[in-house]
Amino acid sequence: MNTKSKITILGISFLFLAFSGEVNAQMTKEKTVMVGGAAMYPSKNIIENAVNSKDHKTLVAAVKAAGLVETLQGSGPFTVLAPTDAAFAKLPKGTVETLVKPENKEMLTQILTYHVLPGKLSAKEIWAAVKAGNGKSMMKTVEGEELTFWTKGKDLYVKDAKGNSAKVTIADVNQSNGVIHVIDTVLMP
């Protein structure tokens, strides 16, 4: 290998290292929120972040089974109310296993899209809507039905069509295509 080739390779290697260092520096500058033991990066989309959360394995599997991965990787924006694995564990035994079967894809999709609001709504915006609504705010989901948001003390809650309430346990997990609010109960249309 001649000297010119070595210099070119060395130059390319230096540029690559400089670029990857710049990317790493950019990632560390982002304001992240820890969810399920993993940092959630605002520069990543909902799916890219969710797959790293140890607390959302069931949700990720359900999203895959429903064929919603591509949708939630799209530009959105979306507000996702993300139930934890513990929330799914509260469902009657065998419910999750039944829902992820191919023949139940339509029902699973309905349940999952009931956890998604169009647009990017911060907890502050939802809180303001609740205040403006004299203690509650109805919001239409992507599925088509409404959820009722309400507050108690410093906590934000959401009630489903069946009257079950979920507490927002981690709010404002910003994503490149929306925001996630972690909840402790699965909502049912």
Where do the PLM segments sit?
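Bacterial Sec-dependent N-terminal signal peptides
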Residues: 1-27
